[in-house]
From Swiss-Prot:
Organism: Galanthus elwesii (Giant snowdrop)
InterPro entries xrefs: Domain_X (IPR024937), Maturase_MatK (IPR002866), Maturase_MatK_N (IPR024942)
Official protein name in the record: Maturase K
Domain of life of the source: Eukaryota
Entry GO terms, CC: chloroplast
Family: Belongs to the intron maturase 2 family. MatK subfamily.
Presence of keyword Ion transport: no
Protein purpose: Usually encoded in the trnK tRNA gene intron. Probably assists in splicing its own and other chloroplast group II introns.
PANTHER family membership: MATURASE K (PTHR34811:SF1)
GO biological process, one term: RNA splicing
Gene: matK
């Protein structure tokens, strides 16, 4: 444990001591606005309550003045909890929520500064100029295609969640030593009304974020996951040292470092040979492969089930030591890749094993060679996608298309554009599927839901509406996949209807998962 502590301290040499004074700088609130607050209460509420957007600078100055007054700062968020119709005037309710949102978003910008600087220095050190290409979600799947076919076991991991938010403050304190700033963080976590929405259920391992303070809570959760992975890096580096030295096979590798230090390797091999009456070959520790998205992760290896079990309890023990809470072992499930399929990033992935027989003729003798090939397979979980469409009110739970009443007041072009965009995005995201027939069922649901929505708007039936305008009206907005591929690739490359079902294409411009895919 002392070695772990020393390893952690080496990587935390840059600690920020002066972040709290940044809250009193006006440009921080301008940065918060530029980072995408146009769709939040920062400005939308000003329009709703009748305030002009130009008064935001004056409100920021008024907020900074109130921050200097400690009592005003303490009651600032508490005022936003109250209902504006009970004992609060129209102005007080707006000011309290407006100030609360400005502090929360600006706090998020400030707390990200030390980690942004650390990322920039890392990219310069590693000479990675175009790191944004690595942000694509689809970049994970070519990696899995290349690696998983050679591995044996995979551990499905649910990232554990802390019991108390004070744990998050304590691990953040290792990076930031500005005491007033950390006190303000505690204030956010314990006093905000939106704290009630900052939960983790037993079925899910990710936070349900508040809409108003989504950026702050997302940062805290991502930082916590980063710390969980930080322990994995430490364990992985310790394990990688073994690959530098050849060693004999030990059925029980307890106190392995002590045995190597105090005993001769040759003597240990002799002991093993005498006990098990066989000669053991030297070997290296197998490589481990780790991939994570949101609150789920997979750890794959070419090793044995015993090795994966030891890794499992390494994770559990280190999490308990470092975060001071009980981590249930059932959150890490070990499975054999050949008999296991896992849901990851909107795909149902598995390892297919195909056998082929080859007849070999040598002079007068012939024999048959059986060859096994492994292939990483990804298919679209149609049932889960239909469930997502059902939650979004595009169809029933059984997949029967229904109209979207909330969109009936839009123009025809807007309705067609929204349905067409959803359909194209789903086809774009699931372009890596090995079987795309299920996507055409999703396309049928969206097309008929669009037709029902338009018919509802014009107070007509679907058949009458399509007969009057023609079914070709929907074809323009639901672009076929073959047409999209023909625009992306040279004309010499032919994509037939049959081939498009098998062709897998991964895009490196997808930096976030589709909302409908994420719901499934």
């Amino acid at each position: 444990m002392e070695e772990l502590q020393g390893y952690l301290e080496k990587d935390r040499s840059r600690q920020q001591h002066f972040l709290y004074p940044l809250l009193f700088q006006e440009y921080i609130y301008a940065l918060a606005h530029d980072y995408g607050l146009n769709g939040s209460i920062f400005y939308e509420s000003a329009e709703v309550f009748g305030y002009d957007n130009k008064s935001s600078l004056a409100l920021v100055k008024r907020l900074i003045t109130r921050i200097y007054q400690q009592k005003s700062l303490i009651y600032l968020v508490n005022d936003s909890k109250q209902n504006r119709f009970v004992g609060h005037t129209h102005n007080n309710f707006f000011y309290s929520r407006f100030y609360s949102q400005m502090i929360s978003e600006s706090f998020s910008i400030i707390v990200e500064i030390p980690f942004s600087l650390r990322l920039v220095s890392y990219l310069k050190e590693k000479e990675i100029p175009k790191y944004h290409n690595l942000r694509s979600i689809h970049s994970i799947f070519p990696f899995l295609e290349d690696k998983l076919s050679h591995l044996n076991y995979v551990s499905a991991i649910l990232i554990p969640h802390p019991i108390h938010m004070e744990i998050l403050v304590q691990i953040l304190q290792c990076w930031i030593q500005d005491v007033p700033f950390l006190h303000l963080l505690r204030f956010f976590l314990h006093e905000y009304h939106n704290w009630n929405s900052f939960l983790i259920t037993q079925k899910k391992s990710i936070f349900v974020f508040s809409k108003e303070k989504k950026r702050l809570f997302r940062f805290i959760y991502n930082f916590y996951v980063f710390e969980c992975e930080f322990l994995f890096v430490f364990i992985r580096k310790q394990s990688s040292y073994l690959r530098l030295t050849f060693f004999g096979t030990f059925f029980e590798r307890t106190h392995f470092y002590g045995k190597i230090e105090h005993l001769q390797i040759e003597k240990l091999i002799v002991i093993c040979r005498n006990d098990f009456h066989r000669t053991f070959w030297f070997f290296k520790d197998p490589f481990m492969h780790y991939v994570r998205y949101q609150g789920k992760a997979i750890l794959a290896s070419k090793g044995t089930h015993l090795l994966m079990t030891k890794w499992k309890y390494h994770f559990v023990n280190f999490w308990q030591y470092y975060f001071n809470f009980w981590s249930q072992p059932y959150r890490i499930q070990i499975n054999q890749l050949s008999n296991y399929s896992f849901y990851f990033l909107g795909y149902l992935s598995s390892l297919l094993i195909n056998s082929s027989a080859v007849r070999n003729q040598m002079l007068e003798n012939s024999f048959i060679i059986d060859t096994l090939t492994k292939k990483f397979d990804t298919i679209v979980p149609v049932i889960l996608l239909i469930g997502s469409l059902s939650k979004a009110k595009f169809c029933t739970i059984s997949g029967h298309p229904i109209s979207k009443p909330i969109w009936a007041n839009l123009s025809d072009s807007d309705i067609l554009d929204r349905f067409g965009r959803i359909c194209r995005n789903l086809f774009h995201y699931h372009s890596g599927s090995s079987k795309k027939q299920g996507l055409y069922r999703i396309k049928y649901i969206l097309r008929l839901s669009c037709a029902r929505t338009l018919a509802r708007k014009h107070k007509s039936t679907v058949r009458t509406f399509l007969r009057r305008l023609g079914s070709g009206l929907l074809e323009e907005f639901f672009t076929e996949e073959e047409e999209v591929l023909s625009l992306m690739f040279p004309k010499t490359t032919s994509f037939t209807l049959h081939g498009s079902h098998r062709e897998r294409i991964w895009f490196l411009d997808i930096i976030r998962i589709n909302e409908l895919v994420n719901r499934s």
